[in-house]
């Protein structure tokens, strides 16, 4: 049974600091990547995925591992929001969401 654990339900970070978002996977799931999104629904934005360039974001532990914790450097007030760790299932055309973590609500203080 595959699960994504996001141990922090909420985090407070100071503007300009580095934000750490924790996510670990347990169990075996389908083939597919894990990515991070901010928000949920039609207006969510991808914060980090394996392919693509995300200059302020890096994985805390390099591949391959079941730890998908990321660090976002030089946090701005616009970074406030709820972040989800998302497991994708590889599809023929597009990857589809298999499961997601419980979400971490991020507050940024100036």
Give residue ranges: language-model regions.
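Extracellular beta-strand/loop-rich beta-sandwich domains predominantly from IgSF
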Residues: 9-11, 55-80, 90-92
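N-terminal edge beta-strand
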Residues: 1-22
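Exposed loop/turn and edge beta-strand positions of beta-sandwich/beta-sheet ligand-binding modules
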Residues: 7, 17, 53, 66, ...
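N-terminal V-set
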Residues: 24-56, 88, 92-93
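Extracellular/luminal immunoglobulin-like beta-sandwich modules
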Residues: 76-78, 82-110
């Amino acid at each position: 049974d595959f699960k994504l654990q996001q141990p922090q339900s909420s985090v407070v970070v100071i503007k300009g600091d580095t934000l750490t978002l924790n996510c670990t996977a347990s169990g075996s799931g389908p083939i597919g990547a894990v990515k991070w999104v901010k928000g949920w629904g039609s207006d969510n934005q991808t914060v980090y995925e394996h392919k693509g360039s995300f200059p302020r974001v890096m994985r805390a532990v390099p591949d391959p591992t079941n730890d998908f914790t990321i660090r976002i450097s030089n946090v701005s007030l616009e970074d406030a929001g709820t972040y989800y760790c998302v497991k994708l299932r590889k599809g023929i055309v597009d990857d589809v969401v298999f499961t997601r973590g419980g979400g971490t609500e991020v507050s940024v203080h100036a």
